[in-house]
Amino acid sequence: MDSYKQYIKQALPNLSIHSYKQNEEGWDNIAVIINDDLLFRFPRKQEYAKRIPLEKKLCTLLSHSLQEIEVPKYHLLYKKDTDTIPLCSYYTLIHGEPLQKEIVTTLEKKELKAIITQLATFLAALHNIPLKQVTTLGFPIEKTITYWKELQTKLNQYLTNMFTSLQKSALHHLFENFFACIATSTFQNTIIHADFTHHHILFNKQNKSISGIIDFGDAQIGDPAFDFAGLYYDFGREFTTSVYEQYSTIISHHDPLLIHRITSFYQYSPLLHNIIYNFETKNALKFIADTEQLKAILQGRD
């Protein structure tokens, strides 16, 4: 803890530190909040650090087309002036709390409608950024068929002793149907947030609206439907469909099968990724709980 505090003091000598909070829950970064005003993100690995300048460029682009929703305004800090990879980034804290399901269920109809509009507007603004522009910036295409096949292989390996042959077969069909769907799809790739879950959607309790979207560290070029996966997983079908219906009226390209890709596969993506993460980080309790959830889903799909 002291090493981060020490570094911040050295990098910003004029900053008086009155309060210091450290959050190590993130998969990619350790977050440090200073004076309830500045949020510093220290990447856990070099590969995450390399993404920070891209994240900054994307947020700058997005800020031009967003009125109500804030995105981080990044400042980058380097260990040495000659370095090209930042040691960390920081931005003025966007106040709000993660949009939990409990918050959504307590909203009045009018408030809920306003939030749905905000989310649809944000996703459309992101997905409408010209592909040529983000390709030039250097955003990668990551969630290819190869990526999903590797994910499938890992799941088969990690779950082999916990699944019956019927469950293994159901998991196989889930993936094979998705691969067949992608093979016949003609959707257009866009820039995607790729980690659009309640953790990264900030809600302002006072005015009952979305105050900001954060953590663009996984941003990449990919299937726009993937950005609805977290919404579906966190808030369910009705909410996600409402966001999609508004989104489809403002998005620049027509994609009639987008909702099908969400309901048939992407809605399970957060759970599948959690299973792998919890196995690899040896979190047995969460791994078992997630595996039981997947078993119930596969049984329901038979």
Feature locations, PLM:
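Short, surface-exposed alpha-helical segments at coil->helix boundaries
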Residues: 2-5, 56, 241-244
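Short beta-strand segments
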Residues: 41-43, 75-76, 191-194, 213-214, ...
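Short helix-capping segments at alpha-helix termini
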Residues: 64-69, 166, 250-255
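Nucleotide-sugar-dependent glycosyltransferase catalytic core
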Residues: 48, 144-152, 226-233
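An alpha-helical support segment within catalytic cores of ATP-dependent transferases
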Residues: 2-15, 79-82, 95, 105-117, ...
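Helix-rich C-terminal or lid/interface subdomains of diverse kinases
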Residues: 114-117, 221, 229-302
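Active-site acidic catalytic loop and adjacent metal/ATP-binding pocket
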Residues: 29-33, 40, 173-226
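ATP-binding pocket architecture of kinase catalytic cores
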Residues: 18-146, 186
